[in-house]
Structure formats: C-alpha cells, structure tokens
Swiss-Prot record:
Expressed by the skin glands. The keyword Repeat does not apply. This is Esculentin-2Rb. It comes from Pelophylax ridibundus (Marsh frog). Belongs to the frog skin active peptide (FSAP) family. Esculentin subfamily. Antimicrobial peptide. InterPro entries: Antimicrobial_frog_2. It is found in: Secreted. Disulfide bonds join C31-C37. GO terms for cellular component: extracellular region. Its main location: secreted. Keywords: Amphibian defense peptide, Antibiotic, Antimicrobial, Disulfide bond, Secreted.
Length: 37
C-alpha cells in the first residue's frame, strides 16, 4: 500500500541523492565541520 510506495520513493530518492549528492554531501560535511551552515 502506501507504505511500500513511500519506501519505493525513498529508495529512488536515495539513489538520486547518492549520485547528485557526492559533491554536495562533501560541501555539506565541510560546512558542518566549519560550523558555517
């Protein structure tokens, strides 16, 4: 039902984030370390 739909969307979003978020995640980590988010 809805739960499996949400799970599917989350999985797809996770894949997209993993692809797109490589450099963004690095920037985010750096800004968290520098505490300047």
């Amino acid at each position: 039902g809805i739960f499996s739909l949400v799970k599917g969307v989350a999985k797809l979003a996770g894949k997209t984030l993993a692809k797109e978020g490589g450099k963004f995640g690095l920037e985010l980590a750096m800004c968290k370390i520098a505490k300047q988010c």
